UniProtKB/Swiss-Prot annotation:
<dbReference type="InterPro" id="IPR020910">
    <property type="entry name" value="UPF0370"/>
</dbReference>
<keyword id="KW-0472">Membrane</keyword>
<feature type="region of interest" description="Disordered">
    <location>
        <begin position="39"/>
        <end position="66"/>
    </location>
</feature>
<comment type="similarity">
    <text>Belongs to the UPF0370 family.</text>
</comment>
<feature type="transmembrane region" description="Helical">
    <location>
        <begin position="4"/>
        <end position="24"/>
    </location>
</feature>
<feature type="compositionally biased region" description="Basic and acidic residues">
    <location>
        <begin position="42"/>
        <end position="51"/>
    </location>
</feature>
<keyword id="KW-1133">Transmembrane helix</keyword>
<keyword id="KW-0812">Transmembrane</keyword>
<dbReference type="Pfam" id="PF13980">
    <property type="entry name" value="UPF0370"/>
</dbReference>
<protein>
    <recommendedName>
        <fullName>UPF0370 protein YpfN</fullName>
    </recommendedName>
</protein>
<keyword id="KW-1003">Cell membrane</keyword>
<dbReference type="GO" id="GO:0005886">
    <property type="term" value="C:plasma membrane"/>
</dbReference>
Length: 66
């Protein structure tokens, strides 16, 4: 078990290389042209800031000062 305390980082590197190889293998399986041909339409962006903007507390420029 002495070797494990000295060379634990090699096991971590082997694990990371295995993860990287599996990711590359899975990404090669994806057909991006087929996905782009059949991609769903995105719904319009809903912005709820319009209600917040109506409650503006800044003074209007054309109003006289009180």
């Amino acid at each position: 078990m002495d070797w494990l305390t000295k060379y634990w980082w090699i096991l971590v590197l082997v694990f990371l290389v295995g993860v990287l190889l599996n990711v590359i293998k899975d990404l090669k399986r994806i057909d991006h042209k087929k996905f782009l041909a059949n991609k769903p339409e995105l719904p319009p962006h809903r912005d709820f800031n319009d209600k917040w903007d109506d409650e503006d507390d800044w003074p209007k420029k054309d109003q006289p000062k009180k």
